[in-house]
Amino acid sequence: RVSSAVSSLVSSGPTTPAALSNTISSAVSQISASNPGLSGCDVLVQALLEVVSALVHILGSSSVGQINYGASAQYAQMV
């Protein structure tokens, strides 16, 4: 599931705000389906851990190039 989350996040690009939401939603659905006995809280915690793992993997395999400070306002709006 983590590799699926990585693929989903990378393919949607860095400026797609819905990508993270969709990835979390997908992880929640998959975890709920494969572990019907888990509580909603447990499912959410597991999903968030998997998404954070995916983000760490992406950051770990990325290389930072030239930074466009002029576009920082656009990225700040996403947060």
UniProtKB/Swiss-Prot annotation:
<protein>
    <recommendedName>
        <fullName>Spidroin-1</fullName>
    </recommendedName>
</protein>
<comment type="similarity">
    <text>Belongs to the silk fibroin family.</text>
</comment>
<keyword id="KW-0737">Silk protein</keyword>
<dbReference type="InterPro" id="IPR038542">
    <property type="entry name" value="Spidroin_C_sf"/>
</dbReference>
<keyword id="KW-0964">Secreted</keyword>
<comment type="function">
    <text>Spiders' major ampullate silk possesses unique characteristics of strength and elasticity. Fibroin consists of pseudocrystalline regions of antiparallel beta-sheet interspersed with elastic amorphous segments.</text>
</comment>
<dbReference type="InterPro" id="IPR021001">
    <property type="entry name" value="Spidroin_C"/>
</dbReference>
<dbReference type="GO" id="GO:0005576">
    <property type="term" value="C:extracellular region"/>
</dbReference>
<comment type="subunit">
    <text>Major subunit, with spidroin 2, of the dragline silk.</text>
</comment>
<dbReference type="Pfam" id="PF11260">
    <property type="entry name" value="Spidroin_MaSp"/>
</dbReference>
